[in-house]
């Protein structure tokens, strides 16, 4: 009896061991298994989310770079096209403007510029020497100044302590200066008179070609112009 009891007792103990061995450690605790599975799922979700987050900023970085490159290329192309078009327009405009200006001014407006100076002034400017550019009033003043200077010098000689010989020399020099001045006047007058005769072939002359003659000028057949 004791042996059978022992055998019966041994059986349940062995069965309990077998049950314990066959059952996994988490089967006895379903709550623990659920918690572990949830943690695993959370970890997997976290890893996926982190991967997505890493990929998203990379994509965001790539997008602006690609967009910036595309914009820069588009702008450069537009600028190049605009410069080419602007250069062609600027080259085309001056020619048209020049033609319009040349065509817009009629011949009647161009001619007055050339005709603005009369022929008489051009001829006179070509024939006048350089000295005649000075006005006549200025020339008269210079002549008067020389005469006044000579008079003042004559009066001052008496006050100076010159000897008789020096006084004679000074008076001779002044006489020479006056003679030169008179001769220069006569030469200029004769030169002007000759110029008048050359300019006017029918200039009135006296009986012996003296100025201011009493007789009227004679006209021979040679003097009459051919009609």
From Swiss-Prot:
InterPro entries per the UniProt record, alphabetical: TF_A-like/BEX
Keywords linked to the UniProt accession: Nucleus, Transcription, Transcription regulation
Location of region: Disordered: 1-145, 202-227
Localization per record: Nucleus
Pfam family, one: BEX
Biased composition annotated in UniProt, kind: Basic and acidic residues: 18-43, 50-82, 90-113, 120-136, 206-227
Chief location category: nucleus
Keyword Transcription among record annotations: yes
GO cellular component, as recorded: nucleus
Protein origin, superkingdom: Eukaryota
Function recorded in the entry: May be involved in transcriptional regulation.
Assigned protein family: Belongs to the TFS-II family. TFA subfamily.
Name the UniProt record assigns to this protein: Transcription elongation factor A protein-like 2
Originating species: Homo sapiens (Human)
Lineage per the UniProt record: Eukaryota, Metazoa, Chordata, Craniata, Vertebrata
């Amino acid at each position: 009896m004791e042996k059978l009891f022992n055998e019966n007792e041994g059986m349940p103990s062995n069965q309990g061991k077998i049950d314990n061995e066959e059952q996994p450690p988490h089967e006895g605790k379903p709550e623990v298994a659920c918690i572990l599975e949830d943690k695993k799922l959370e970890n997997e979700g976290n890893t996926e989310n982190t991967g997505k987050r890493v990929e998203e900023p990379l994509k965001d970085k790539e997008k602006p770079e690609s967009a910036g490159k595309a914009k820069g290329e588009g702008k450069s192309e537009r600028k190049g096209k605009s410069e080419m078009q602007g250069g062609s327009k600027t080259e085309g405009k001056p020619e048209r403007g020049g033609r319009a200006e040349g065509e817009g001014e009629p011949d009647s407006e161009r001619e007055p510029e050339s005709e603005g100076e009369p022929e008489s002034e051009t001829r006179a400017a070509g024939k006048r020497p350089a000295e005649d550019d000075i006005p006549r009033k200025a020339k008269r003043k210079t002549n008067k100044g020389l005469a006044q200077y000579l008079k003042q010098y004559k009066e001052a000689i008496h006050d100076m302590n010159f000897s008789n010989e020096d006084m004679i020399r000074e008076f001779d020099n002044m006489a020479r200066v006056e003679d030169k001045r008179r001769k220069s006047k006569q030469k200029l007058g004769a030169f002007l008179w000759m110029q008048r005769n050359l300019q006017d072939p029918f200039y009135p002359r006296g009986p012996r070609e003296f100025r201011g003659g009493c007789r009227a000028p004679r006209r021979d057949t040679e003097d009459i112009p051919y009609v």
